[in-house]
Amino acid sequence: MKKKDKTYHVKNFYDGDKKLEKVVLEVKNGFIYKISRKGYLSSQAFDIVVPTFVDLQVYGSNQSLLSEYPNIKTLEKMDSFHKKNGTYFFQPTIASYPYEVIYKSLEAIKNYMNQNPESGCIGLHVEGPWFNPNKKGAHIIDYIHRPSEKAINEIIEKSKGKISMITLAPEVIKVELSLIHI
């Protein structure tokens, strides 16, 4: 769904580094592409506009872990929880688990994002299982292993573009990283 082009007049805009006063934000396809003072109308201005927060590592919310309940209902709970608490965008995360759990999570993410294109879900963060067992942190050792080229290609294929991040230990990857195309 293509977002409409819009213009917003803003008394106080925080751009992430500094506060700008009395500006006009021009938005195209859902993105701010121009900020200027030309044409500012105080009668149409919002008092304050700030960027939204983004949570890049979310295992679950409201008593639903994605690894335990890899379904649309869990993602709806995550989305609702984050919006109620001031975070618009979120990245559901699956830690080191068997591929079956990762695949079910991917399927839920694909379905949720396709059914809710305006949601705050930005894709799945696959955190493991391709870690160095000596540096596993809180990950379950039984699920940590070195990936094969086949395993990498399979998870990428199943993702259909819905993996937004993969956390791995580069020293355990024996496959040419140029083969990975998300």
Name what the model sees in each region.
Residues Y59-Q63, E76-S105, S119-N132, S159-I173:
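Divalent metal-dependent hydrolysis catalytic cores, especially in the metallo-beta-lactamase
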Residues K77-S80, K104-N111, K150, E154:
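Alpha-helical scaffolding segments of alpha/beta enzyme cores, especially the outer helices
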Residues I180-I182:
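Conserved small/polar residues in nucleotide/adenosyl-binding loops
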Residues N132-E157:
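Conserved phosphate-binding/catalytic loop of the ribokinase/pfkB sugar-kinase fold
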Residues M1-G39:
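N-terminal metal-binding scaffold of metallo-dependent hydrolase/deaminase domains
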Residues I102-K104, N134-I141, L177-S178:
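Short acidic, glycine/serine/threonine-rich loops at helix termini
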Residues G39-F46, S105-E118:
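Short amphipathic alpha-helices and their capping/turn segments at secondary-structure boundaries
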